[in-house]
Every structure is written in C-alpha cells, then in structure tokens.
Amino acid sequence: MSDVESGTLEPFSRDMLADPYPAYRALRERGRVQRTPAGHWLVLGYDEVSTLLTDQRFGEAAGRGGRIRLSRTQREGPHQLLGRVDTMLSQDPPEHTRLRRLVSKAFTPRSVQKMRPLIQEIVNELLDGLAGRAEFDLVSELAWPLPVIVIAEMLGIPRADRGRFKRWSDAMVATLGGDYSSLDEARRSNEELVEYVSRVIADRRKQPRDDLISRLVAAEESGQKLSEDEMLGTVALLLVAGNETTAHLVSSGMLALLRNPEQMARLREEPSLLPSAIDEMLRYTGPVHTTRRTAREDVRLGDANISRGEVVVGILAAANRDPEKYADPDRFEVARNATDHVAFGDGIHFCLGAALARLEGQVAIGTLLARFPNLRLRHNEPEWGGTFAIRGVTRLRLRSV
C-alpha cells in the first residue's frame, strides 16, 4: 500500500511529491492535531495551524534541534548556511522584532511596487527568447531564472554575476530543504556569498545607491542599525527564500491552470482576476508545505495537550485544503479570492517577501497567458521535486503552437 493510500507521510516518495494532498486529507480525518511515532506533533487543520502561527506560546528559537533527532551533519549543516548569525526565521521577540522592523524599512510595499516595471522587463526578455519555439520547458526558461534575476537587481548585483548568485542559491536551498549530500558545496557557496556581499556592503557604505543593500545599510530604528552579520544573514535569507519558492509558484501555478482549462479560459477573459488567481495558486498548490515551532509552555491546541519543549510541525498545505475553511477545497477556482490562506505563514513570521512573490507571479503568469494563447501540456507528466518543507514542479514541457 502506498503512503497516499495509507495516509502516512513519506516525504521523499514519488507519490507524495506528485500529489501529497490525499495523504494530507487522510491524516487530517484521523485528527487535526496528532502525535507521530517520532514524538513530535503534526497540525493539519486550518484553525489549528493559524493558532500555531500566531500564538506566541509557540516559538521559533527554542525549536532548532528540538526533540527531532538529527545526525551531526544535519545539526551542523543548515543553520550555518544563512550568514554568520541567526536570521529572522529562527528568532523570537525581542530580537526578531528589532530585526524585522529594521529590515522592513528597506522592504516596504512602495519599494516592491516600484519593481513592477523592472519585473515586466525581465519577464519580457525571458519570453522573447521563446518566440517562434513550438515547445519549451517553462521551469528552466522562465520560472527558475526570474526570481534570481529579480533578487540580483534588487540587491544591485551586476548582470555578469547573476550566474554565481544562482549557483550559490541552488546549493544552499538544496541543503536547507533536506538534501545533505551537497553540504560541502553549500558551505563553499555560503563562504563565497559572504565574501561577495561583504564587499558590496563596504562599497555601499561609501557610495550608496538606489538598491536594497544601500537601504539595509541606511535602515535605523531607535538609534540602532543592522550589524554587518545581520545584513549578511538577511541577504542570504532573501536569496534562498525568494528563489525556489517563487519559481515553484510560477511553475506549479501554471500547471494548475493548464490542468483546469476552463479556469485558464476564464482568466484570459477576465485578467482582472489575476491577483485572485495567484492567491488561489498559493492556496491550492503553494510551494511551502510545512513550518516548525516549539511549545514555549504547556499548550492545548485543538484536542491535544502539548508539553513545553515539544516540537510541532504545521502542515500549511493541508490547512489550505481544509474543508472546514474552504468550500470544495480540492477544486481550483481563480475567482475564489482566498487571501486568507497560510501559504506565507501568519503572525510575526509572516513572509516579508509575500508582496514581491505575488507581484512576480502576477507579471510572469499574466504575460505568459497574453503572449502565448495556445499553451498546452505535452503528453508527458511534469517532474516534481522537493522535500517535506518545499515542493514544486522542476520540469514542465509545454507546447505553444
């Protein structure tokens, strides 16, 4: 019996990568909060996941290591790869509050919206390369290059160095996602990234520009500024968190449209639905599937009594398909307007790059639909990749004529 049929979680199995939702549904029907044989907790219901994300009795910092047994390689690997200090993702207040306030000053909605013309230009350039081609892989030609180029432009990185940024990001993402076979390469990439960004920071201190690193250098809150280590951690986090997840939003979102041609036709007819469609893609097939917290005190969550220090894994993707929250949750509807999904998390750790990811998705998918009216899937199935934390399409062959 497969893991999908039995309702168990085998994160790296072919069945789970191709379609984890039947297993999530089966697990949720057994219990919205349940203990695993390994001794930690899974949370699958929308309300319960929302509480996990917003209730400050659950924290981030205490959870690293937690009660999940890790090998030495696992313990020493991922947490060294986002700069030389903890990032916002691994901190609780008050340090998280201070750091997020400082970084937010350089990442305002206005700053993100100013990126729209540039993102449109990048998308146009990438799609120009597909003109006249009857067939192409959406992932390698658009979904993967786009976020790396956008992030490099935000940071003020020269075009000639984009390839290096892509290599650094790919190596670090693989390890942070659970692939420890490439740990040495990820460490080298981290060292190269730190050295490179340190030089850029030093340059921006002397000669500020209109870019994100200059804004990080200038950011100040109550007389406090970001240390160099904090800036390095923030840049590395942006590079890692903004690369794979946005790429998967574009590729998996397009796959959802192509598998639901009536919804794609409606979106073509009503392009004003594009913001709603992007949020539906995030709800229906969002790239981030899980997040982890640790109970900072004894907590009752749903019907479960969770003890202080116990690790709790929230399955965001299961919450986003909870029938108690969404009517007909396994149906993809571009007009659903599901802005309350938890694909970006919630609470103090809500994704700082959510507005940018939405904007990239809107520009990429909207332009693709406008320029390629005859898009359709090839007969072969798409290829899926990822881990228990992040999942997405890694190859998607399309025909355009």
Give the ranges of each region predicted by the language model.
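Cytochrome P450
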Residues: 1-401
